[in-house]
């Protein structure tokens, strides 16, 4: 069987594509949300009420971003550079110490 006259062209095109294109679903820098601030597009932001907080850490545990850390007393602190306003923290809070309020810019 004769070799296709287009084989060299196809191989060259495949090589160029694999060198130039990023395949989907591959994270070249896993965990890059720490590098790239992700909080600029939220519509709602968490507002914290310290007097209602029992320091259960559920907001910290369930936050899908690195947007909540705990201060030296164990109270949550929100990093609005990374908070996307998803509301999971407010939903998980058993004492309603976190309320989602409309973002004002």
Curated annotation (Swiss-Prot):
Keyword annotations: 4Fe-4S, Electron transport, Iron, Iron-sulfur, Metal-binding, Repeat, Transport
This protein's record includes keyword 4Fe-4S: yes
Residues the entry annotates as binding [4Fe-4S] cluster 1: 53, 56, 59, 93
The protein's required cofactors: [4Fe-4S] cluster
Cofactor note: Binds 2 [4Fe-4S] clusters.
Superkingdom field: Archaea
Pfam families linked: Fer4_21
UniProt binding sites for [4Fe-4S] cluster 2: 63, 83, 86, 89
Domain (4Fe-4S ferredoxin-type) ranges: 44-73, 74-103
GO terms assigned for molecular function: 4 iron, 4 sulfur cluster binding; metal ion binding; oxidoreductase activity, acting on the aldehyde or oxo group of donors, iron-sulfur protein as acceptor
Assembly information from the UniProt record: Heterotetramer of one alpha, one beta, one delta and one gamma chain.
PANTHER family reported for this sequence: PYRUVATE SYNTHASE SUBUNIT PORD (PTHR43724:SF2)
Protein name (Swiss-Prot/TrEMBL): Pyruvate synthase subunit PorD
Organism: Pyrococcus abyssi (strain GE5 / Orsay)
């Amino acid at each position: 069987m004769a070799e296709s006259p287009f084989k060299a062209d196809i191989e060259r095109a495949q090589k160029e594509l694999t060198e130039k294109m990023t395949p989907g679903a591959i994270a070249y820098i896993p965990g890059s949300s720490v590098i790239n601030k992700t909080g600029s597009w939220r519509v709602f932001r968490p507002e914290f009420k310290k007097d209602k907080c029992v320091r259960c850490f559920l907001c910290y545990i369930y936050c899908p971003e690195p947007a909540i850390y705990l201060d030296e007393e164990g109270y949550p602190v929100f990093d609005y550079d990374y908070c996307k306003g998803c509301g999971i923290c407010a939903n998980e809070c058993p004492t309603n110490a976190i309320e989602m309020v409309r973002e004002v810019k």
